[in-house]
UniProtKB/Swiss-Prot annotation:
Protein's name according to its UniProt entry: UPF0391 membrane protein RHECIAT_CH0003936
GO cellular component: plasma membrane
Principal location class: membrane
Record carries keyword Cell membrane: yes
TM region(s), chain numbering: 4-24, 33-53
Key words, A-Z: Cell membrane, Membrane, Transmembrane, Transmembrane helix
Compartments (UniProt record): Cell membrane
Coiled coil: none
NCBIfam families: PRK13682.2-5 (NF010234)
UniProt similarity note: Belongs to the UPF0391 family.
Pfam families linked to this entry: DUF1328
Length: 57
């Protein structure tokens, strides 16, 4: 489960880079939405992994 949390974290960082660097207006909007969604999913999976008692990293 922690693997998925890290995958969504990387996706959110990449989407955030494109969304906040001023690539284009349409791309920026889509990237900002994906950044938010991936960040929320990352946090959910991180909390679930910690609650399950799995080792972090």
């Amino acid at each position: 489960m922690l693997k998925w949390a890290l995958i969504f974290f990387v996706i959110s960082i990449i989407a955030g880079f494109f969304g906040f660097s001023g690539v284009s207006a349409a791309t920026a909007t889509i990237a900002r939405v994906l950044f938010g969604i991936a960040l929320v999913i990352f946090l959910i999976f991180l909390v679930l992994a910690l609650m399950a008692g799995q080792a972090v990293l």
